[in-house]
Amino acid sequence: KLDSSRRTLLERINAMGIDAREDEVFSSAYATAAYLKDVLRFPTDRKAYVVGMNGLEDELDANGIQHIGGTDEQDCQGLDGLDFSPLASKDALDPSVAAVVCGIDTKFSYRKLAKAFRYITRPGAEGEVRAGEQNGGCHFVCTNEDVTFPSSEGLFPGAGAVWKGIQVSSGRDPIVVGKPHQPMIDTIFVRFAFDKSRTLMVGDRLDTDIAFGQRGGIDTLLVLTGISTLEHVHASDAAAVPTYVVNGLCDLNTALS
């Protein structure tokens, strides 16, 4: 949910007593970096402007994609009142940037919003991204569309809440890589040749997790410990209907034993 790197997620999984390898872990941050590199063929001499955190930056690094913004201290700071001069100066934007990549960002600032806006609305931004050029085309790619995520302290805004401000102000729709969208499905299916009939997608959201499994042609299991409830499942306008529903993962363990 927090666009963690595969390494960070692997540490959490291993700490739960589950034996797994890094190449078996797929996060929206990893899928986004892989999509930029392998599908969009992002030029190695261009940069991504990041609205996001360490996990997203780590995966961009692992895929050889240069980036700025993100955890940079200056970009995490707001402006001084209505003084827009720091964003309007000649050197405010890097002409080598050819993608705005957005995920969850707990240090999201007006400076980041404005820079992302200016990159994807500059002249020619919706055109082709080319190597060896300055300015021109600029992709708008987001990790996932979760507008909220559950934590031990309650419900908080997610990545979708961050990038929608950029979308609304710029008028540009992003490429959303994570669940339930096709880029994530393609990344997993290309990496592993597995039997869909023996696969189960487990998640806590109808609109992302369960819809993702259905689009991928696999059975789904909704866990009622997160966002979606039985009321959501039975609603006439349900985003998706799961194959199975359990109160918690302990119920799944009982069923499999």
Cite the ranges covered by each PLM segment.
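Asp-based, Mg2+/Mn2+-dependent phosphohydrolase catalytic module
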Residues: 2-23, 33-257
